């Protein structure tokens, strides 16, 4: 158990030491009438490299074939396209206070069925090196389904099952440790009692012999 705890603590320290940007996939199921966050995270390969980044989001509604641009975010300015499906519903939720964007996520408020479809987060990054500049581009694709009621995904179900299994295993281990300790303490107590009894009998026997010797001498 001590080894397991050490490994867990070590992993946490390593994770903390690395820190920085971590690319995470977006959820793909939004609930009708609720606010939904579409994740778009694009990390630099080298965090120490200076960069400037901007993004454009495009959308293809379910049942259609063409992508249309819905927004552009550059130099901390959000430019929304005229689209009644997203009018007053899109909120920037990515990096702020920097031109070096790595989190380019957005919120869609009051989700409707018209928001079902495919989203593309286009990331355009200009990297600055000592003697030159380099342009890169990445496209993050997200397929979104809008449902009436939230469904639990398989990952959360498995996580909950594993949590209960871990609780049961730890409980059994704790009970076994308590039984083992109880037996060990009981055995030690019994051995000490037997040792005390033996010492008492030896002292009693010696006292009787001394008394007998005194009577004979008289």
UniProtKB/Swiss-Prot annotation:
What is this entry's stated membrane topology? Single-pass type I membrane protein
Q: Where in the cell is it found?
A: Cell membrane; Perikaryon; Cell projection; Cell projection, Axon
Q: Does the keyword Ion transport apply?
A: yes
Show the Gene3D superfamilies listed in the entry: Immunoglobulins
Which InterPro entries does the record match to this protein?
A: Ig-like_dom_sf, Ig-like_fold, Ig_V-set, Na_channel_b1/b3
**Disulphide bridges in this chain?**
21-43, 40-121
| Official protein name in the record | Sodium channel regulatory subunit beta-1
Q: Which organism is it from?
A: Mus musculus (Mouse)
